[in-house]
Amino acid sequence: MANQGGFKKKTFGWVIKDLQTHRRCSVPILIGDSYWRLVALPNENGYFSLFLEVNMELIPCGWRRYVEFRMTIVNHISPIHSVDKKGWRWFDENTKNWGFKDMIPAVILNNVNVGFLLNGEITIIAEVEVHEFIDTLNASQVEELSDDSSEDLQNKDNVTIEVNGFQVLDSQVDQVNAIFEKHPDLISNFSLKNQHIRNAYMHALLDLTKTLSKSTKELTVEDMNEADNTITDLIKAGLNLDWLRQKFDQALEKQIAYDTRIGELEKQVKKRKLAVTELEADLEKEKAAASASLMLFD
């Protein structure tokens, strides 16, 4: 087994304010003897991609480091639904970056109801541990040091319960069970395996049902448009939501009818108020004329 010469570990945050740019890079951070940064591709083939990259221009020839890293996209509504992944890799002149092409679907990340987007920004937390080894490790020894680089981490700080392949909070279990009881074919075409992404889609569905349970007075046009987009995204992901789409379309049709009728009545009220104002003005004129006429007999 090789002797470990030491390691440097650092945790840092990155707030991305513009998700429309094709490529975004964080400020370089010094960890050990090298500078590291995060590189994001906001919409690479439908996914938000995230990578760790070392600045090869500032390191000596023959440099090689074993790096363990963990990346978290923070969910501001429910931390349990934060997307959290870890990986390991040897970085050298042939491998200067490594990460996750499918960190999270772009439609989920950009949905304001899901919780990753806050005031148009997303927050990423990176934990990077750079190891310096005196000798070179062989492949079997590296296996002893770390898990597979594609493994997802579970958030150990929160207790969750599995319901039909989804990790949900204890307070959400009854709601999720009720949905599956009424719609047992909900995930018959849902083939995503990544646990965190599956959880994110379920969270979006639960948030959607919460939004649609409000009275029409509480829902704005923006709420309805956002709900419409969310249903479309969830159906594209493979969830069988024809029943929800039908209910939503019916509710939207009624809402449009109500809004139209309310608009017509408001116009009539304005017209009648204007007519009353004109009548009041005529009344005052008549009173003034009558008063002037009576003064002729004084």
Curated annotation (Swiss-Prot):
Keyword Coiled coil: yes
Ranges in coiled-coil conformation: 240-288
Domain MATH: 9-128
Keyword annotations from UniProtKB, A to Z: Coiled coil
InterPro entries linked: MATH-CC_domain_protein, MATH/TRAF_dom, TRAF-like
Domain of life, per lineage: Eukaryota
A Pfam family hit: MATH_2
Name assigned to this protein: MATH domain and coiled-coil domain-containing protein At3g58280
Lineage: Eukaryota, Viridiplantae, Streptophyta, Embryophyta, Tracheophyta
